[in-house]
Amino acid sequence: MAVSPTAKRKFHHPFRNLSRQSSSARTSAEAPPLPAVDQVLGGSADVSGGDQGGPGNTQPESPPAPLTRPPPPPPIFGSFSSSTCSFQSSISQEDAKPPYHPDTELKKVSRSLLRLQKYSLILGFVSINAGFIWALWNYHHYWYIFLPFLAANTFCQVIFAISNTIAATFTTLRRKLGFKKDVVPENPEKFVMVLPCYNEDRQEVETSLNSLINQQNIDEHPRLIMVIVDGNAKAPGEEVSTQDFLLNDMFAGGERIEFQNGYSARDGFFMPVTIQQGKYRGVPYIIIGKKHNQGKRDSLCFVRSFLWHYKNRSADISTMFNPDLFDYMGSILTDNGLDTIDYLCGMDGDTVFDDDCVYELIKALRRGGPDVVGVCGAVLVKFDEKPWGWWSVPSSQPPFFAWFTETNLRNRNLLQNTEYNLTQGLRREFQSRVSGKVNCLPGCCQLIRVQDATFGDAVLRERFGHVPKPNDTMTQQIMGVYSEDSIHASIIFSRHPKSQTRQALRARAYTTAPQSWSVYLSQRKRWALGSKSNEFVMVFRPGIIWVERLCSFITVTTWWLGPFVVAAMFGFAIALVRQGKKIFENHIMIGLMSVLAFRYAAKEKFKEKMPPV
């Protein structure tokens, strides 16, 4: 049996080991001081001996030294003692163990179970769509039989548009009449801004960080930036890994401590972690550098579980964290005025916030009341001042050849932006205004309350952080890897049915579209499989309201019958060519076309016209 890469890591017993690198610290302390910065930059550093520059000594004039910048300051390896820190806890660390026993699991059912499920689903997908297409072409006179499958999603979105209009009008009237006012708490909320990284380049990370620093109207809120880096991957074109340039360049000079046993990762092994703290442009930060790659979900479990146990002041329980690491990070928060954490603000390494994005998220969460546990913003494509064309064709290439050139294709930006508008439009706005159950809080722009309903162990560790076993079903395998944002929301609704989520359209974030077709298609595969698997499970998951069950059923059915829907569109085009304007003499056809026009017009205008919730 092949051994997975993570299985090569050795188990470490839960001991408190802090690597100090004292020898390097002593070496740097004994070294002569560096010349002043202005001397180095000016090329006038005096490197000659003290008695060689007297009046009687004439030295040949040497050429001026080249202009160089001083190296970044070395990290300060701190000395941490749990007994003297400002924050202390009584938690213990759970034992290191794999999430399942491979031999036992593989003996229960054959390893070909997933392969059997895969080909069975493909066979069913092809057979059902082929049967529907055959029936459509041979029995098109019975069109009313096929109408529910073709028009169910469209009619649902028309209902969404009408409901959104009524709800928005009602909300506007209540605000103008003074029945609904914004409540500002006496003590500003305290929150942590989390930035997960993997292989982002220097410019992407710096742009994202600066957008967090430049947020307006939140100066009175105590806050901290928490950057967690998953492994040591390099970005294309970078000489060092993302973790290296974050620790040693962008955040150089901070206090650093290394934990050989930091926490128990999702695979059951102890993860070595590097913690660095300091201030970035006046805002306190913590960098959490994981030695091994365990995926974004593992990083989210670490940060969210830590914030919950820190706020809850968990005592005498077993957690994933090394007690020394937990106390050290808790001391950093306490020393920076965050004795409690109200919110977690999440973004991605390739995302840029509007200047008032976080403020709009906070306002939306306040307006919802205590039952609203999370808010997401409006995610748009960052076009980087490029034209809106489908693609750009250089003059040196023929247009037809350039159409097949991956680096010149521009339509993925437009497709990405269109998909964002569709997903954030009618249904998500309906979920925000009417049902109160936005079933996806995108990780690139979200604000979540730190409480048991969102980050408690029952939600986070037992369900969200579940590692699929080899013999789990295909749906469980997909949900254990993809679409962590929508899966987290559905788990919250299932275990805490009274919890609600919202969407704040005025909180805007801009992301970079995939830069190649291979990455774009890979993203589509992950999003489609993850979201549709979650929609399928929501049909049967306990605690989900009936409206969301019905919408999920219609969404999954329409997606499953995609080839049949495309074939019906071709059939309509052929009928339009053959019959011409006679086809519009049918009143039912006119009604269907009007419904489609209303649907797309409503999607196009939802962001500009909708007032805040």
UniProtKB/Swiss-Prot annotation:
Q: Please list the residues annotated as glycosylated.
A: 17, 312, 421, 471
This entry carries the following GO cellular component terms, namely:
cell septum; plasma membrane
Sorted alphabetically, which keywords does the UniProt record give?
Answer: Cell membrane, Glycoprotein, Glycosyltransferase, Membrane, Transferase, Transmembrane, Transmembrane helix, Virulence
What residue spans carry the Pro residues bias annotation? 61-73
| Polar residues bias spans | 18-27
InterPro entries referenced in this protein's UniProt entry, alphabetically: Chitin_synth, Nucleotide-diphossugar_trans
User: Recorded GO terms, molecular function?
Assistant: chitin synthase activity
**Gene Ontology biological process terms, A to Z:** chitin biosynthetic process; fungal-type cell wall organization
| Pfam families in alphabetical order | Chitin_synth_2
**Where does the sequence pass through the membrane?**
119-139, 142-162, 556-576, 583-602
Topology relative to the lipid bilayer, per the entry, is: Multi-pass membrane protein
Is-annotated flag, keyword Lyase? Answer: no
Kind of enzyme, top EC level? transferase
Disordered: region residues? 1-73
Q: Does the keyword Glycoprotein apply?
A: yes
Disruption of the gene: reported phenotype: Significantly impairs conidiation. Exhibits a significant reduced pathogenicity in Arabidopsis and cotton plants.
What job does the chain carry out?
Polymerizes chitin, a structural polymer of the cell wall and septum, by transferring the sugar moiety of UDP-GlcNAc to the non-reducing end of the growing chitin polymer. Plays a role in cell wall integrity. Plays a key role in pathogenicity. Likely contributes to post-penetration virulence.
Q: Which family does it belong to?
A: Belongs to the chitin synthase family.
Please identify the protein, giving its name as recorded: Chitin synthase 8
Organism, scientific name:
Verticillium dahliae (strain VdLs.17 / ATCC MYA-4575 / FGSC 10137) (Verticillium wilt)
